[in-house]
Amino acid sequence: MKISGVDIRPGNILEYEGGLWRAAKIQHTQPGKGGAYMQVEMKNLIDGRKTNVRFRSAETVERVRLDTKDFQYLFADGDMLTFMDKETYEQISLPKDLLGDAVAFLQDGMDVVMELYEEKPISVQLPEQVEAEIVEADAVVKGQTASSSYKPAILDNGVRVMVPPHITAGTRIIVDVNTQEYVKRAD
């Protein structure tokens, strides 16, 4: 579906110069001289490249709709991850780098949403928050309790996060997958 350059919104998938791009940030600009344009920061869904493009209001761009399907993560085999379609039970293997940093939070049996373009996997969306266990936490430094201070801790998946002083090793916490930050203590 063709849309005007000024109708682009963050999260839109665009077909641009033969590739699939996700609009990350947009800025609408109306200079005093000349026509209005939309400054769009885009990320390539295939290879992860980023680019900034100006779209004038008269320009049109192809907006792509991706199909989404529910999958379940099964196991890792070297650099490949195996997922199972929850409807047809078919298995599919994808390279680890398709998930980026989020691969550390992948857990056996985790439900994920896969985005497909023409039946080809483009990206894998993990749940926004996952539960993890602290395996190592630094001691609290005395005298730092006046302001809200955080201390470094290492999760069971090897990821380093900053946690409040009351969190100790062995505590289960909820972590935001995208920002890799502490959210709250797990119940």
Swiss-Prot record:
It comes from the Bacteria. Pathway: Protein biosynthesis; polypeptide chain elongation. Its main location: cytoplasm. Keywords: Cytoplasm, Elongation factor, Protein biosynthesis. One of its GO terms (molecular function) is translation elongation factor activity. One of its GO terms (biological process) is peptide biosynthetic process. CDD domains: S1_EF-P_repeat_1 (cd04470), S1_EF-P_repeat_2 (cd05794). The keyword RNA-binding does not apply. It is found in: Cytoplasm. Gene3D superfamilies: 2.30.30.30, Nucleic acid-binding proteins. GO terms for cellular component: cytoplasm. InterPro entries: Elong-fact-P_C, NA-bd_OB-fold, Rib_uL2_dom2, Transl_elong_fac_P/YeiP, Transl_elong_KOW-like, Transl_elong_P/YeiP_cen, Transl_elong_P/YeiP_CS, Transl_elongation_fac_P. Belongs to the elongation factor P family. Involved in peptide bond synthesis. Stimulates efficient translation and peptide-bond synthesis on native or reconstituted 70S ribosomes in vitro. Probably functions indirectly by altering the affinity of the ribosome for aminoacyl-tRNA, thus increasing their reactivity as acceptors for peptidyl transferase. This is Elongation factor P. It comes from Zymomonas mobilis subsp. mobilis (strain ATCC 31821 / ZM4 / CP4). The gene is efp.
